[in-house]
Amino acid sequence: MAAKEVKFGNEARIKMLRGVNVLADAVKVTLGPRGRNVVLDKSFGAPVITKDGVSVAREIELEDKFENMGAQMVKEVASKANDAAGDGTTTATVLAQSIVNEGLKAVAAGMNPMDLKRGIDKAVIGAVEELKRLSVPCADSKAIAQVGTISANSDEKVGILIAEAMEKVGKKGVITVEEGSGLQDELDVVEGMQFDRGYLSPYFINKQENGTVELENPFILLADKKISNIREMLPILEAVAKSSKPLLVIAEDVEGEALATLVVNTMRGIVKVAAVKAPGFGDRRKAMLQDIATLTAGTVISEEIGLELEKATLEDMGQAKRVVITKDTTTIIDGVGDKAMIDSRVAQINQQREEATSDYDREKLQERVAKLAGGVAVIKVGAATEVEMKEKKARVEDALHSTRAAVEEGVVAGGGVALIRAANGIQQLCGDNEDQNVGIKVARRAMEAPLRQIVANAGEEPSVIANNVKAEDGNMGYNAATEKYGNMIDMGILDPTKVTRSALQYAASIAGLMITTECMITDLPKEEKPDVSASSGGMGGMGGMM
C-alpha cells in the first residue's frame, strides 16, 4: 500500500479552500448576460470556447492533491446541479464558494463547525420554501421562449426555436439537439412513430422519385420471430389480398423464400406489401413491438403467448392511416389505436422511467413515450465553424434542460433576484444557539453572491446594485444586459424554480461537508527512479568499436 500524506485542521482547510477558489473563479466568469468566455485547450484539434460552467469545471485538475480535492468537491456541486435540472451549474458553484469561504472564516474564529452546518441547512430549507412560494407556473410559449433565451446566454432565436418545438411535440415530447449542416438553426419535427429500420428490399419502393415506400391505410402485421417460410404467411396474405389494402410486415427478420414471395407479389401487383425489421434488440424489441401494437390496435404474433402466424387473422392486424418507409427509417402516421390504451401504455412506460437506474435506459424510455405520444422534434444547430458549433450546441442543450425544468416547477425572477427575496423571507429565522445563527447568516450572505457576480461580470459595482435590489421588493431587480432596473418577469428575465432550488440545495450540501472537514488524506507522490540505461555511458561490451 502506498504511503499517505495527512493534513489536519486549519492547514487542511486552507489548502482545500485554495482549490475551491481556483475552480470557482474560473467558472464564475461565465455567469450572466455579460458573462465572459473561457478558452479550453484540447490535446488535439482547435481550442474550445465556452460559456458553459460545467464544461469549464470538468477541465480543471490541479497539481497539488489537497487543493485538487477542494476543486473536485466543487466540481461535484456543478455536476449534481446539472444532473438534477440540466442548468444552474455556475450559480451552484458561486453559492458553494461563498458558503465555504464565509463558513471557514467562522470556523477559524472559533465557531462550532457542526452547528454552523445545522444553521446553513435550516436556512436552505426555509429559502427553498420561500422559492416555492415565489414560483409562477410556466405555461405559455412566450414564457418558455424567455427561459430558453436566458439559458442560451440571451440568444433569442434559440428560445423561440425551443418554444416552437415544445408546441409541436408537447411539453413532455422528445426534443433532441444535433449539429446541422448549414449556417442557420433549423427545427425538424417527425410526426407519428418513427423507428430506425428501413425496407428489407428496394423492390418494395413505390415512389421512385424519392426512393420511398408509401402505404395508404395499410394492415400492419407484427411478428416477434424470423419469417423465412412463406407457408406461415399464406392465410394472412390471401385475406389481405381480398381486402385490397396494402400490408406492412414488421418482424424480427423476413428472409429467404418469404421475402422473395412478398417481392414477387408486390411487383406483379397482386398485393401491395412492404417488410421491415422490428426496432431494437432483445427485450427492448419486444417492448417496442408492443408499443406499435398499442398505437395501431394490433396484436403481436408471438409464440411465447401461444399465437401462431398460420392462425393469424385480419383482427390481429394493426392499422394506420399512412406508413412511409425510407432506406433507413419507418414512420407510422395516425395509428388507429384507442387513446385510452395509448395513455395507459404511456403511463406504464413513465413509471418504468422513474424506476430506471441508468441514464441510457431513462433516455430510451423517454423516446418510447414521445413516439407513442405523437412525435420527436430535432433542433439542428447551425454555425460557421466547428468551434462555434460545439459552443452553440452546448448552449442549446442547456437551454432545453432549463425550459423542461421551468415547465415542471415554474419560474422565479432571474438575475439572482429570487435568491435575494428568499434570503429576505428568512430574516426572522433563528437557530438553537449563536453558532447556528451564524450559519444562517452565512447562507443568507451566500444567496447574494450570484447577483453580485452577474453585476461584476457586467463591469458594474456589485455592492451598490445589490443594496438597491435589496431595497426593492417582489420581482424588481437589475437587468445587467441593459443596465436598467425593473420587473424581472416583465423583462423576460426568468429562472426555472427547479434550477435555482437545485443549485442552492447542492451547493449547501457539499459546502457543509467541506466546512466540517478536519482531516485530509492523499497518496504521497511516487519518487521517480533514475533511468539506469540513460545514465550508463554507452552500450556495454562495445567499448572498442568505432
From Swiss-Prot:
Together with its co-chaperonin GroES, plays an essential role in assisting protein folding. The GroEL-GroES system forms a nano-cage that allows encapsulation of the non-native substrate proteins and provides a physical environment optimized to promote and accelerate protein folding. Residues 537-546 have a biased composition (Gly residues). Forms a cylinder of 14 subunits composed of two heptameric rings stacked back-to-back. Interacts with the co-chaperonin GroES. It comes from Baumannia cicadellinicola subsp. Homalodisca coagulata. Its EC number is 5.6.1.7. This is Chaperonin GroEL. HAMAP family: CH60. Gene3D superfamilies: GroEL, GroEL-like equatorial domain, TCP-1-like chaperonin intermediate domain. Keywords: ATP-binding, Chaperone, Cytoplasm, Isomerase, Nucleotide-binding. It comes from the Bacteria. Belongs to the chaperonin (HSP60) family. Residues 527-546 are annotated as: Disordered. GO terms for molecular function: ATP binding; ATP-dependent protein folding chaperone; isomerase activity; unfolded protein binding. GO terms for biological process: protein refolding. It is found in: Cytoplasm. ATP binds at residues 30-33, 51, 87-91, 415, 479-481, 495. InterPro entries: Chaperonin_Cpn60_CS, Cpn60/GroEL, Cpn60/GroEL/TCP-1, GroEL-like_apical_dom_sf, GROEL-like_equatorial_sf, TCP-1-like_intermed_sf. GO terms for cellular component: cytoplasm. It catalyses: ATP + H2O + a folded polypeptide = ADP + phosphate + an unfolded polypeptide. PROSITE patterns: CHAPERONINS_CPN60. The lineage of its organism: Bacteria, Pseudomonadati, Pseudomonadota, Gammaproteobacteria, Candidatus Palibaumannia.
